[in-house]
Regions:
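Hydrophobic beta-strand scaffold positions of dinucleotide-using enzymes
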Residues: 53-55
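Rhodanese-like catalytic fold shared by cysteine-dependent sulfurtransferases
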Residues: 2-8, 17-39, 44, 51, ...
Length: 133
């Protein structure tokens, strides 16, 4: 009887440790960016004051038209130039490109560089608001 009780306690302890270990292994908070809609990005632009709009298209594409107050940094230059252009890694950064593909790549690269508040909102092709040249 004592042996059965001891085995039961050991089994419960082992299962508890296994459950805790499993929870801990799945609780890996990986940093990531947030994908938002153009409408959500516009709301942020209209209501917030402390943010950066980052256009990750080429210089030529940027010159053809961009969102007002956007800063241009080609997505291919993120890893080499982002820290000089964007020194505050906690700043809210709104990222876009032409169609949404490059902005996702750029947003991911920014997160890998340690930026903590990155929101990607697709491409200027889907931007229904003002564009400046």
């Amino acid at each position: 009887m004592k042996l059965l009780k001891g085995l039961t306690i050991m089994l419960i302890l082992n299962l508890s440790l296994f459950a805790l270990t499993s929870c801990q292994a799945n609780n890996t908070d990986t940093a990531s960016y947030e994908q938002i809609s153009p409408e959500e990005a516009k709301t942020i632009m209209d209501t917030e004051t402390d943010y950066v709009i980052l256009d990750v298209r080429t210089v030529d594409e940027y010159a053809e038209g961009h969102i007002p107050n956007a800063v241009n940094l080609d997505h291919e230059d993120i890893s080499s130039k982002a820290e000089a252009l964007l020194p505050d890694k906690d700043a809210l950064i709104l990222v876009y490109c032409r169609s949404g593909r490059r902005s996702k790549i750029a947003a991911e690269a920014l997160v890998e560089l340690g930026y903590s508040n990155v929101k990607e909102f697709g491409g200027i092709n889907d931007w229904p608001y003002e564009i400046v040249k």
